[in-house]
């Protein structure tokens, strides 16, 4: 194990010099620095660049407070390695695989794997055309998720990405009972804490491993924490042969941390100030999140859209890797429609008759057509009023408004805020409900009866309460 000495500390960047003739650590190797002689408090560094003359530039995974020039640095000879396997379920980790949930830490004999690996080879990959039922109507009908696919939840600030991810975790754990890995990347610590206690109360935590590198962490930790969560998920896929759900909130913060690290390393910025290696870094992460012949990883990633600009390089780079996109729209939030999923902008590779079936596909296509036509007529209605429309157009507008409200529903995880019980709607019920609205069976019911409900039976019950 070779050792060097710290020559420079600039925030999270630490330069380490190794003696002439010593073997230099490889890129991505983990180095360890002990702050004092007792060797109780250590800081992990990751090698990022070789500067020449035996000097390497590293990024710290923790705060560099207390580091001084001349401190000894040890090369571990391998990348950061984190615990894997069934023992990780029910536990909360940081980027280094250390437990942060106050329970007993993992011993040195626990099985660990490095966070840097190659993506599966082409002949190991597997494709599936099975739908993952979420119980959320707007997703299941118009942008269904594939088992083993990649899903992006796009949206600006405060439109409901995290709540939607929490509802998906709740529904999938309750209805499907699969193993989940939740990775919090550069998001609010409070939200992570709330999620942990909610999952503990509901019992879902027993089938979930949680990894956090939140907003207050150095950029190195925020950049690598997604790989820590992915490594845990890969073990369940490759060794245990399981179907795993990987939740990442938020993939934009991964890009943002990469941008900070790139600037700290002195690289010339690219478009909009992002790192020149943006596409490479995103590709290295996304290519590992895939399904193989041994098992599958279904990933659901929240992606923050800066200033609601979808052409920003960060969300635009992520788009290329996804099977389904769920776009959250601020205008729908203003209308009080939750989840605020834009039915026309959201898309899925799975919405094809050979995957979802002829009836589902036909109903989804007709719902989109009606909503698109309503969208086109809104300018006429705003300027001239409803009276200028033909009878056929008036009927279409009335049905479109009912469809728009019926696409909303109350969430189980938001019950404490709304006071309304959440609902899980099976796909068959969803398709039947929208088919009946399109056929005009519920034209006489008030629009308000369709807002925030589950199945079409709930609409009828709500209308009855309203006196219809």
From Swiss-Prot:
Q: Identify the domain of life.
A: Bacteria
Q: Which UniProt keywords apply?
A: ATP synthesis, ATP-binding, Cell membrane, CF(1), Hydrogen ion transport, Ion transport, Membrane, Nucleotide-binding, Translocase, Transport
Q: Where in the cell is it found?
A: Cell membrane
Q: Report the membrane topology from the UniProt record.
A: Peripheral membrane protein
SUPFAM superfamilies reported for this sequence = C-terminal domain of alpha and beta subunits of F1 ATP synthase, N-terminal domain of alpha and beta subunits of F1 ATP synthase, P-loop containing nucleoside triphosphate hydrolases
EC number(s) recorded for this UniProt protein: 7.1.2.2
Catalysed reaction equations from the record: ATP + H2O + 4 H(+)(in) = ADP + phosphate + 5 H(+)(out)
EC class (word): translocase
Query: CDD domains this protein is in?
Result: ATP-synt_F1_beta_C (cd18110), ATP-synt_F1_beta_N (cd18115), F1-ATPase_beta_CD (cd01133)
Q: Is this entry keyworded Repeat?
A: no
GO terms (molecular function) for this protein are: ATP binding; ATP hydrolysis activity; proton-transporting ATP synthase activity, rotational mechanism
Which of this chain's residues are annotated to bind ATP?
155-162
Gene Ontology cellular-component annotations: plasma membrane; proton-transporting ATP synthase complex
Broad class of the protein's primary localization: membrane
Give the coiled coil ranges.
none
How does this chain assemble? Answer: F-type ATPases have 2 components, CF(1) - the catalytic core - and CF(0) - the membrane proton channel. CF(1) has five subunits: alpha(3), beta(3), gamma(1), delta(1), epsilon(1). CF(0) has three main subunits: a(1), b(2) and c(9-12). The alpha and beta chains form an alternating ring which encloses part of the gamma chain. CF(1) is attached to CF(0) by a central stalk formed by the gamma and epsilon chains, while a peripheral stalk is formed by the delta and b chains.
Q: What does this protein do?
A: Produces ATP from ADP in the presence of a proton gradient across the membrane. The catalytic sites are hosted primarily by the beta subunits.
- Which family does the similarity line name? Belongs to the ATPase alpha/beta chains family.
What is the name of this protein? ATP synthase subunit beta
This chain's source organism reads: Streptococcus gordonii (strain Challis / ATCC 35105 / BCRC 15272 / CH1 / DL1 / V288)
Q: Which gene encodes it?
A: atpD
């Amino acid at each position: 194990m070779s050792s060097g000495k710290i020559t420079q500390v600039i925030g999270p960047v630490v330069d380490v010099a190794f003696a002439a003739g010593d073997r230099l650590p490889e890129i991505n190797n983990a180095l360890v620095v002990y702050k004092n002689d007792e060797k109780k408090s250590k800081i992990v560094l990751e090698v990022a660049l070789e500067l020449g003359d035996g000097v390497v530039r590293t990024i710290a995974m923790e705060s560099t407070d207390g580091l001084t020039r001349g401190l000894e640095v040890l090369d571990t000879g391998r990348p950061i390695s984190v615990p894997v396997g069934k023992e990780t379920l029910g536990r909360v980790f940081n980027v280094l695989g250390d437990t942060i949930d106050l329970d007993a830490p993992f011993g040195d004999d626990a099985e660990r794997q490095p966070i840097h690996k190659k993506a599966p080879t082409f002949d190991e990959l597997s494709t599936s055309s099975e739908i993952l039922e979420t119980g959320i109507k707007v997703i299941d009908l118009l942008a269904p998720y594939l088992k083993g696919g990649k899903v992006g939840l796009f949206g600006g600030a405060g439109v409901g990405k995290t709540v939607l991810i929490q509802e998906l975790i709740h529904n999938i754990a309750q209805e499907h009972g699969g193993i989940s890995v939740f990775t919090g990347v550069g998001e609010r610590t409070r939200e992570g804490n709330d999620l942990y206690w909610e999952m503990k109360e509901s019992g879902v935590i027993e089938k979930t491993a949680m990894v956090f590198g939140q907003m207050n962490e150095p950029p190195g930790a925020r950049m690598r924490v997604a790989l820590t969560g992915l490594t845990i998920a890969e073990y369940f896929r490759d060794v245990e042969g399981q179907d795993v759900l990987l939740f990442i909130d938020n993939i934009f913060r991964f890009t943002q941390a990469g941008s900070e690290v790139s600037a700290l390393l002195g690289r010339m910025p690219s478009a909009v100030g992002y790192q020149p290696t943006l596409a490479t870094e995103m590709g290295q992460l996304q290519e590992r999140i895939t399904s193989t012949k041994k098992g599958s990883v279904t990933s659901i990633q929240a992606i923050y859209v800066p200033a609601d600009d979808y052409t920003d390089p960060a969300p635009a780079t992520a788009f290329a890797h996804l099977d389904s996109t769920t776009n959250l729209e601020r205008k729908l939030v203003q209308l009080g429609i939750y989840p605020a999923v834009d039915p026309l902008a959201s898309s899925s590779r799975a919405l094809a008759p050979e995957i979802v079936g002829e009836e589902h596909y036909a109903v989804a296509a007709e719902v989109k057509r009606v909503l698109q036509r309503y969208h086109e007529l809104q300018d006429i209605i705003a300027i001239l009023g409803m009276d200028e429309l033909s009878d056929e157009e008036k009927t279409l507008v009335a049905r479109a408004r009912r469809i728009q409200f019926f696409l909303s529903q109350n969430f189980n995880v938001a019950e404490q805020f709304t006071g309304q019980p959440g609902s899980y709607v099976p796909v068959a019920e969803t398709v039947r409900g929208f088919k009946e609205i399109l056929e005009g069976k519920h034209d006489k019911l008030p629009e308000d009866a369709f807002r925030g409900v589950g199945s079409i039976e709930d609409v009828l019950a709500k209308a009855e309460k309203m006196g219809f």
